[in-house]
């Protein structure tokens, strides 16, 4: 299984990122500015998570090549590529012409469901195969990969999927019509911050309720190498 992850991490950004870009470009009226926003804001957000999680809090580590202090240089593109394809398929159920609040809520629900499940599956087998090492309270207590990942993945990735789905639909609704630069950058900044703050806040809150601690404590020092 680890071989799959080692290959997929290169195939995803090299092969599927251009495909995802083209699909979104077609949906978004062949507008490169809106397509670039939908594709690259998540890339930046996902880089933020891995840099802070690995370097600052030492919550996990990538056991692959190439890495820089446990971080894949291409990590943001790996995750954002899968996300872009998932959300493109999800939003096939929400036509471009639907621009009301219900369209955004539907995109958020679909994103939470799909992204939450598939990232739980991906992360579980990445941990089981040794591709990723996580240093959370559950894994330090001897929990299995399934138990440890299930402790955080549904909330973290589910809320991330909801934010991502809502972000791309808001961008579509507001930016496909004529718009100014101010609105464009407002959507970009708002989407990026939401993708970072909401999943982080949801994870910290649920972890505090379940375990009585913030969820930012690394157990790498008490675990066997």
Go through each PLM region and give its residues:
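Aromatic-rich, lipid-facing transmembrane alpha helices and their immediate juxtamembrane interface loops
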Residues: 1-225
């Amino acid at each position: 299984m680890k071989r799959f992850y080692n290959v997929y991490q290169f195939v995803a950004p090299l092969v599927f990122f251009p495909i995802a870009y083209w699909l979104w470009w077609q949906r978004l009226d062949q507008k490169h500015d809106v397509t670039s926003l939908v594709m690259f804001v998540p890339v930046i957000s996902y880089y933020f998570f891995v840099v802070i999680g690995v370097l600052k809090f030492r919550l996990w580590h990538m056991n692959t090549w190439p890495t820089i202090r446990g971080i894949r240089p291409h990590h943001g593109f790996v995750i954002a590529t899968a996300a872009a394809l998932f959300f493109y398929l999800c939003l096939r159920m929400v036509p471009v012409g639907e621009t009301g609040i219900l369209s955004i809520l539907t995109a958020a629900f679909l994103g939470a469901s799909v992204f939450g499940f598939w990232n739980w599956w991906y992360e579980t087998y990445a941990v089981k195969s040794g591709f990723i090492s996580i240093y959370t309270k559950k894994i330090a207590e001897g929990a299995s990969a399934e138990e440890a990942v299930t402790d955080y993945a549904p909330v973290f990735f589910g809320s991330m999927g909801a934010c991502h789905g809502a972000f791309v639909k808001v961008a579509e609704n507001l930016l496909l019509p004529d718009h100014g630069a101010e609105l464009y950058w407002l959507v970009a900044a708002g989407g990026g911050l939401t993708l970072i703050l909401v999943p982080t806040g949801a994870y910290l809150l649920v972890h505090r309720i379940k375990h009585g601690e913030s969820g930012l404590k690394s157990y790498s020092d008490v675990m066997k190498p």
